[in-house]
Amino acid sequence: MANPKEKTPVCLVNELARFHSIQPQYKLLNESGPAHSKMFSVQLSLGEQTWESEGSSIKKAQQAVANKALTESTLPKPVQKPPKSNVNNNPGSITPTVELNGLAMKRGEPAIYRPLDPKPFPNYRANYNFRGMYNQRYHCPMPKIFYVQLTVGNNEFFGEGKTRQAARHNAAMKALQALQNEPIPEKSPQNGESGKEMDDDKDANKSEISLVFEIALKRNMPVSFEVIKESGPPHMKSFVTRVSVGEFSAEGEGNSKKLSKKRAATTVLQELKKLPPLPVVEKPKLFFKKRPKTIVKAGPDYGQGMNPISRLAQIQQARKEKEPDYILLSERGMPRRREFVMQVKVGNEVATGTGPNKKIAKKNAAEAMLLQLGYKASTSLQDPLDKTGENKGWSGPKPGFPEPTNNTPKGILHLSPDVYQEMEASRHRVTSGTTLSYLSPKDMNQPSSSFFSVSPSSTSSATVARELLMNGTSPTAEAIGLKGSSPTSPCSSVQPSKQLEYLARIQGFQAALSALKQFSEQGLESIDGAVNVEKGSLEKQAKHLREKADNNQAKPASISQDCKKSKSAI
């Protein structure tokens, strides 16, 4: 309601009920909705009629149902009394006396009210007490009237009223009507007098000692207080203090040092006030350079390299629009592989973003909104490796990032097509020929004729390599007996210990390499079967083979000769 004195619908319903001598009844029918936004349903019964209405509170529901009852009720309404006329014509709550006081202060003229005695009533009848004539001895009292005289500057006004306050208001009203249209008089006091009055007002609450120090400071004069005399008994001592202010000095006496100091300052202050006033020095006005307003950049190129969320918020602030509104739409995926979908709304524009967590999803949504609004992508300004301070020369896998997985078996090297073609070309350049190779220990159970085998040609080797690269297994290698191993060099590339073990197995005896080596280094012969020889005719041959195994063979030709000798011996 605009006017607080206006009656509410509930009040009007109560008046209507009193006019018809009935009792209104309000009933709370229903209460629904969440705790922060409930809705109340109220029923009003007025006589035989009922009305229902809802509101966000019980009071609002009552007001709504009462307003509905006033509109739809068929009961005759009482006649409204007219409002009382305001006797005071002055608008607002300000009385004429208060308004006159403000005007008098502006004019610099005080408003003085003086009450006046009322005029005596004239007695036109003499009480002669004639017989037979009607003479009223007791007259009715006449109404008393108060008079007030108002003086504002050189103007006088008179007011009258039934009370003294009414008389003051009447006089103030007359003064306002007369002085409102008159110009305000200008005062031009002398600068010296006004300055002295202002100084006196300022110095009213200061002590004499403080005033002495202020005057001495303004005139660059030294000040010193000194107790020159102390006399009297201990319980009634008297102190004399001398104060010196430049060329002026004075003495003061009192029963305490503080009192004597104050009296001395009062005496010297009277002499200091006689000095001529100091010339007024105008202080230069301080000039403050205005800082230029910070320019908020909201162009398409602004903010590249920033966080998209911060960049989008700054753009909205520069536009003086509402900040972006982020909403989590859904959360899907396995417990350890979640995927969040975040939506951002800027005005009428809507964009979404996904990510493994809410932070990345929010960032992607802000990036999508920036692109949708016509801004460039928020590219990073520097390499992430430079930020983390990692070694630039390290080309291995970065910590914290999973390596890409493949389904190929381990041990197979994947080559690019260019490298593979170069390998094939280099293999074809090698002249094809037959070379001798040594069999693996797994094939030692085969006959001695298979000890030296013919190696496959370069064409078959290329076929085996191609099958291993493509499929991981080589049927060709299994067919020719290589079993995935590469072609070997001649007999010279086989370790001497393997050769010794193979020859000992063929000859039918066992050899312990550690014992043989230990005894050979010490220059001793074995006692208890370090080397057990079943056939005495082969002892010299085994000793010869042992020496060949311990020494480094320098030439492949010597090895092939030994191999031939051992074969012929067998």
From Swiss-Prot:
Residues 8-75, 95-181, 207-274, 307-375 form the DRBM domain. GO terms for molecular function: double-stranded RNA binding; Hsp70 protein binding; kinesin binding; mitogen-activated protein kinase binding; ribosome binding. Residues 83-94, 551-561 have a biased composition (Polar residues). Residues 194-203 have a biased composition (Basic and acidic residues). A motif (Nuclear localization signal 1) lies at residues 273-291. Induction: Expression in extrasynaptic regions of muscle is induced by denervation. Expression in myoblasts is induced during differentiation into myotubes and by treatment with nerve derived trophic factors such as AGRN (agrin) and NRG1 (neuregulin). It comes from the Eukaryota. Residues 71-94, 178-203, 381-413, 545-570 are annotated as: Disordered. The DRBM 3 domain appears to be the major RNA-binding determinant. This domain also mediates interaction with XPO5 and is required for XPO1/CRM1-independent nuclear export. Interacts with microtubules. Isoform 2 and isoform 3 may also interact with ribosomes, and this association is independent of translation. Identified in a mRNP complex, at least composed of DHX9, DDX3X, ELAVL1, HNRNPU, IGF2BP1, ILF3, PABPC1, PCBP2, PTBP2, STAU1, STAU2, SYNCRIP and YBX1. Interacts with the exportin XPO5. This requires RNA and RAN bound to GTP. Interacts with TRIM71 (via NHL repeats) in an RNA-dependent manner. This is Double-stranded RNA-binding protein Staufen homolog 2. It comes from Mus musculus (Mouse). The lineage of its organism: Eukaryota, Metazoa, Chordata, Craniata, Vertebrata. The gene is Stau2.
